[in-house]
């Protein structure tokens, strides 16, 4: 409902942090790559980010974004500790964006237990322009993560799952 609707000519890289254990994100990436016009792959440590590619954070590792030079961003996948029992953890990924020169960041918060993503986005919003679209309560299997983000006041728009991609593409101007 989200990834397959992103067009093949999408001009930016996309990073998906999905709470999945080691060994499952590779098959998820392969399946989404079959269903999507966008290139989808499991993120690899040291890999440069490329426009038109969606990188799925590797299960069982912590994913961060590293900037080597202005405009050059790389994935870092490390065997760091779990945070809140999560590996990968969206908060850790968002926190890594603070130290980059990215000036505008778009985020989607989908169904999930707990409050992962909220603290990271709050921190990011202190120094960057961040737009957040979250899945609405009615279309969530578990309303935890979108609810936490909404209660923290960091969500710009809440929409049904079927409208997430269209809404974000409109916000980005694609």
Regions found by a protein language model. Give the residues of each.
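Conserved acid/base catalytic micro-environments in cytosolic active-site loops
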Residues: 1-174
């Amino acid at each position: 409902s989200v990834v397959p609707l992103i067009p093949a000519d999408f001009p930016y890289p996309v990073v998906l942090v999905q709470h999945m254990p080691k060994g499952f994100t590779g098959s998820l990436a392969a399946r989404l790559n079959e269903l999507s016009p966008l290139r989808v792959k499991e993120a690899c440590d040291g890999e440069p980010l490329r426009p038109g590619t969606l990188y799925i954070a590797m299960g069982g590792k912590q994913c961060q974004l590293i900037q080597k030079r202005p405009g050059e961003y790389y994935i870092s996948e490390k065997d760091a500790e779990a945070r809140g029992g999560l590996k990968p953890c969206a908060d850790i990924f968002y926190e890594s964006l603070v130290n980059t020169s990215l000036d505008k960041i778009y985020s989607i918060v989908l169904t999930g237990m707990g409050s992962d993503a909220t603290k990271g986005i709050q921190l990011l919003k202190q120094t960057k322009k961040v737009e957040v679209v979250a899945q609405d309560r009615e279309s969530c299997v578990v309303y935890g993560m979108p609810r936490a983000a909404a209660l923290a006041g960091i969500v710009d728009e809440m929409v049904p799952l079927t409208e997430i991609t269209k809404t974000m593409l409109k916000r980005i101007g694609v």
